Design a protein with these regions (language model features):
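Positively charged, low-complexity intrinsically disordered leader regions
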Residues: 1-6
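Short, conserved phosphate/pyrophosphate- and ester-handling motifs at nucleotide-, phospho-/glycolipid
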Residues: 22, 164, 232
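Active-site nucleophile and cofactor-binding loops and adjacent substrate-binding regions
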Residues: 7-15, 33-36, 58-61, 229-230
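Conserved beta-alpha-beta core of the PfkB/ribokinase-like small-molecule kinase fold
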Residues: 105, 109-188, 205-207
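Conserved N-terminal subdomain of the carbohydrate kinase-like
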Residues: 28-110, 131
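Alpha-helix C-terminal capping segments
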Residues: 17-28, 241-246
């Protein structure tokens, strides 16, 4: 999809961002989505080709997705996400099935599951993956495009949950988790959904990574912020690539 800022448009969306950052570590990655038979779709293919990014983008009879992005004074984004677009209608294809059966890790979110078509495809893809593959649920709550059912079903399928400090409070309220601290809520989710790991990002404070046996906290480096759009995908892609390359939890986190 295209993130449309006041100053112009940029390719966005968690699949592209995650796949790009995983590829920076020398791993084979592939962005999976759908685009329209339109100029915006053509431009996405051209951009992906220019950047050497592998993709499986199905052409469908819906417009290519766009998101209107505005930044507040702290460069934190708010989104107006167009509905009824191509990525709401990702079809399951033989090529996608073959990709799933050869996949070591997948990162999926809640937003693309707002439509029945894409939700069915995402869940079918996950179910076709090898038993020992990693399933990362990067929750990415946006506006009203999530339900308790989508969140719970996704966490049940996942090995790793990636969530931020705002989202974890929403999930805790949704699931009637009474623990107050972010860390304790993470522990509840670990146990309740039999997760291997929870990654909790806390903006400019830092980030937690928790398993049943260990935990790690790393402060966020002090930097000049231009925009936080895609920051979570960058973090997740880099962390997961490090884990796949055999680094320890602490090494991957740092």
């Amino acid at each position: 999809l295209w993130d449309v800022f006041p100053e112009g448009r940029k390719i966005g969306g968690a699949p592209a961002n995650f796949a790009y950052h995983v590829a920076q570590w020398g791993l084979d990655s592939c962005a999976v989505s759908a685009i329209g038979n339109d100029e915006l779709g053509d431009d996405i293919v051209r951009k992906f080709d220019e950047n050497g990014l592998n993709y499986r983008l199905e052409r469908v009879d819906f417009p290519t997705g766009t998101v209107q992005v505005t930044l507040d004074e702290n460069k934190v984004p708010s989104y107006n996400i167009m509905e009824g677009v191509a990525w709401d209608n990702i079809p399951m294809t033989p090529e996608l099935e073959a990709l799933a059966r050869d996949c070591r890790a997948v990162c999926f979110g809640s937003l693309a599951q707002r439509s029945a078509v894409s939700r069915a495809t995402i869940n079918a893809f996950i179910d076709m993956m090898p038993e020992d593959s990693l399933k990362i649920f990067d929750i990415n709550l946006r506006q009203h495009y999530y339900t308790e059912e989508i969140i719970c079903d996704s966490m049940k399928k996942a090995d790793i949950l990636k969530i931020n400090d705002e989202e974890i409070l929403v999930v805790a309220q949704l699931l009637d988790v009474t623990e107050k601290s972010e860390r304790e809520i993470c522990k509840v989710l670990l146990d309740k959904f039999d997760l291997r790991m929870v990654i909790l990002t806390c903006g400019d404070r830092g980030s937690y990574v928790l398993t049943r046996d260990e935990s790690s906290w790393v402060d966020t480096p002090k930097v000049s912020v231009v925009s936080t759009v895609g920051a979570g995908d960058s973090f997740t892609g880099t962390f997961i690539a490090s884990i796949l390359l055999g680094k320890t939890l602490r090494q991957a986190h740092e």
